[in-house]
Amino acid sequence: TIERLLRHWADSTQRGQPDDEALHMARFSLHAMATGGIYDQLGGGFCRYSVDDQWMIPHFEKMLYDNGQLLALYADAAFATGDGVFRRIAIETAEWAMRDMQSPAGGYYSALDADSEGEEGKFYVWTPDAVRAILTADEYNMFAPVYGLDRPPNFETASGPSLARGPRTRV
């Protein structure tokens, strides 16, 4: 749908009657996905879907084919709009795929399971104490409000990889 919105906007622009509403819907959706819980803010790449209606908690599985399609979509959106956020997301998604999904033999793995060592999202969530252990006090004070560590956890007993923000408009 987002790809179709971008193509429609590009076609309408070439005809001299740009459909700005189509562009707005595409940009809004892409930004919401990039700042919500399905995008891995630290490692890059997208989780398969969200398990809550605010798009803050991902199902921690990452599929190569989903990320390939999203990489192409964000690259196209960056090219069409000049939006630096879309460019960054495309680059980070490509870097994630090459770093984490490529096998030593040169092929690619199809997915990363949501469960690690018998625990869902084990390597995608953190506690304030775990973050304090690796950051200085000043770094933690900047990091915590951005990633929601100054509030109750958003996933079981820890917090997941979404940018913190106030109430959202539904996507």
PLM features: residue spans?
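Glycan-recognition and catalytic cores of secretory/periplasmic carbohydrate-active enzymes
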Residues: 1-171
